[in-house]
Every structure is written in structure tokens, then in C-alpha cells.
Design a protein with these regions (language model features):
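Transmembrane helix-bundle core of multi-pass membrane transporters
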Residues: 126, 130-197, 224-227, 246-255
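Single transmembrane alpha-helix segments in multi-pass membrane proteins
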Residues: 20, 24-28, 32-89, 121-127, ...
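Alpha-helical transmembrane segments within multi-pass membrane transporters and channels
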Residues: 87-138, 285
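Hydrophobic core segments of alpha-helical transmembrane domains in multi-pass membrane transport
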Residues: 14-27, 55-56, 80, 109-112, ...
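Helix-loop-helix "hairpin" substructures at the membrane interface of multi-pass membrane proteins
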Residues: 100-108, 115, 119, 173-250
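Transmembrane alpha-helical segments in multi-pass inner-membrane proteins
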Residues: 236, 246-312
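Cytosolic-side transmembrane-helix boundaries in multi-pass membrane proteins
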Residues: 1-23, 148, 216-223, 293-316
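Loop-to-transmembrane alpha-helix initiation sites
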Residues: 44-47, 130, 176-184, 225, ...
Length: 316
């Protein structure tokens, strides 16, 4: 009986914590319980959920992907630079013709995919720990981002003046539901299917649980590692483009520390850092918990320095 209770608490404790947190903030300020607030929380969580889903893949095999934040930043700058309004005076590419919306987004996704493949290649072919490999990629991506961002005529100025159709992707919605939330839900469903209903996802759990046993059972570990990082890189790029659309611009500092938030959300959501354990719903609740804390503390007017202490404590 005690073991059943412990198992139940370990699986669902975070859901109770999230509910309790909402109740506490609502008691402090009842206006917190509103459609507007919940919509804001969902919008702010959407890109973080996509990033965390990507980061969870490396955690599943007992690693950590530190390149997430910088790939988000690179994707934000790249997509924003290609999707400025033709009439904007300070365009990144003054003579670039207006491209169909999907073309720059596809280019951005491919860049993320290539960086992900680089991560996967280094980890799978040279047996470099994911932590080390992605640390190197993080620095490479940040350097590439700043070089690109500093190109004339932009010269490291914040990229603004984005096209209306791109901004609509980040701020608009369908039937009252923001597009970014819809995209996050679709990606979440796809990732759940991949992780639970495909041999690829099941093999990742096997690799994380016992790599030697997975090899003996015929799993191509190197191939799976290569493609898990490719998927992660693509997700980071999608999130970066959505961040640019949501905020109306981009700088080379976008995505700073996002990888740590993503890893923390996964761990809080029940993912084991030793690998082999974790669920997609756990990622979602982990991200929502952090978003509610961050949004809620600001909502009730807490001193910013106390917010930093609490945010640090929640990660501990």
C-alpha cells in the first residue's frame, strides 16, 4: 500500500503543486483567475514547451542538450531578417524580394536541422558526451548568430519591422485560440505519438534505460542518436521563429539560458537525468509550472530580486 502511495505521489505530485500554486496566487490576487491571464500563460508557455520537448530527447538517453537556447536565438534572428516588411526603412536585406511565408520558415527549420545533425554526428560517431558536444555547438551557434547579426547594413541593431503575416503567426489566432498555442499543441501530439507509438520512440527509451541491452537487441543506437538531435534542432528552430513572431523582432541575445529552463522543466516533470524515464505530459506540466511561477510572481508585484531567489530555488 505504501509503495502504491509513493508511486502515485511521484507520478502526480507536480500536478498538485501546479494546482496549489494557482490557488495561492489567486488568493493573493483573485483577478489572476481570468481567461486573459490563462491565455497569456499558454502563449508564454508555447515556445518553451516546443524547446523543452526537443531538450527532453537528449535527457532520455542520459545526456543534456546545451545548444537549445543559442539555436533558438539564431533561428529568431534568421527568420526575422528574412521576413521584414518590404516598406520598412532599416531592412536587413534591402533588396530581398518578398518571399512566401513558408520559404523563410523552411530555411530556418533546415538550419536548425543541420545543427541538430551536427550534434548527433559528433555524439554518435565519436562517442562524445552530449553535454560536451552540444556545449561546443552552443558556442558555434552563438558565434554564427552574432556574425550574421552584425552584417551591414544591420550592424547589430535589433531586427524589427516584421511582415504582418509573420506577426499574425505570433500574435493572431483562430476562434480565440492563439496560433502559437495551436502549433505547440500539434507538435506536442506529434511528439507523443513518436515517443509512445513508434519503434523509434520506444527504442530511445531502451537506449536510455540500458544502452548495451538495446545494442544486443538489434537497435541501431548511432542512427537513433543522430536523428533525435536532428528532431531537437528542428524544434528549436521552430520555437525561435515563433519567438520572433510573438515579440515582433529579434536580437542575437534571444534564447539566452533557455536550455537550462528547458532541462529544469523536464526534470521537474519527471524526466530522469540518467535516462530512460519521462513522459510528454510531464514536459508540458513542468513548463507550465515554471511559467505560472514567473508570471504569477510578477502579477502579484513581488520584488524582482526576491523573484530571482525564488526562481533559483525552484530549480534546486
Amino acid at each position: 500500500m505504501n509503495n502504491k502511495i509513493k508511486t502515485y505521489l511521484s507520478q502526480y505530485a507536480i500536478y498538485f503543486v501546479l494546482l496549489l500554486l494557482i490557488i495561492v496566487i489567486a488568493i493573493k490576487d483573485p483577478s489572476f483567475i481570468s481567461v486573459r491571464v490563462f491565455k497569456d500563460i499558454l502563449v508564454q508557455s508555447s515556445t518553451r514547451i516546443i524547446i523543452a520537448l526537443g531538450a527532453s530527447l537528449a535527457i532520455l538517453i542520459g545526456g543534456a542538450d546545451l545548444s537549445a537556447g543559442r539555436l533558438v536565438g539564431l533561428a529568431a534572428v534568421l527568420s526575422a531578417s528574412l521576413l521584414q516588411d518590404p516598406n520598412y526603412s532599416a531592412r536587413f536585406f534591402p533588396h530581398l524580394p518578398q518571399l512566401p511565408l513558408l520559404v523563410p520558415l523552411l530555411i530556418t527549420a533546415i538550419v536548425g536541422l543541420l545543427f541538430g545533425l551536427l550534434n548527433g554526428f559528433v555524439v554518435s560517431r565519436f562517442n562524445v558526451p552530449p553535454f560536451i558536444a552540444t556545449l561546443g555547438t552552443m558556442v558555434i551557434a552563438y558565434g554564427a548568430d552574432n556574425i550574421y547579426f552584425s552584417l551591414p547594413p544591420n550592424n547589430s541593431q535589433p531586427i524589427a519591422g516584421l511582415r504582418k503575416d509573420f506577426l499574425e503567426l505570433g500574435t493572431g489566432g483562430f476562434l480565440g485560440i492563439p496560433y502559437v498555442v495551436i502549433i505547440a499543441v500539434v507538435i506536442t501530439i506529434i511528439m507523443w505519438i513518436i515517443m509512445n507509438k513508434t519503434s523509434f520512440g520506444k527504442n530511445l527509451y531502451a537506449i536510455g534505460g540500458n544502452r548495451e541491452a538495446a545494442v544486443v537487441s538489434g537497435v541501431d543506437v548511432k542512427k537513433h542518436i543522430l536523428w533525435l538531435f536532428a528532431i531537437a534542432g528542428t524544434l528549436y528552430a521552430i520555437a525561435g521563429a515563433l519567438e520572433a513572431a510573438r515579440t515582433g523582432g529579434a536580437t542575437s541575445e534571444y534564447g539566452t539560458m533557455y536550455e537550462l529552463d528547458a532541462i529544469a522543466a523536464c526534470v521537474v516533470g519527471g524526466w530522469s537525468v540518467s535516462g530512460g524515464v519521462g513522459t510528454v505530459p510531464g514536459v508540458i506540466v513542468g513548463v507550465l509550472l515554471f511559467t505560472v511561477i514567473n508570471y504569477g510572481l510578477t502579477f502579484i508585484g513581488m520584488n524582482p530580486y526576491w523573484q530571482l531567489i525564488i526562481k533559483g530555488g525552484e530549480r534546486v
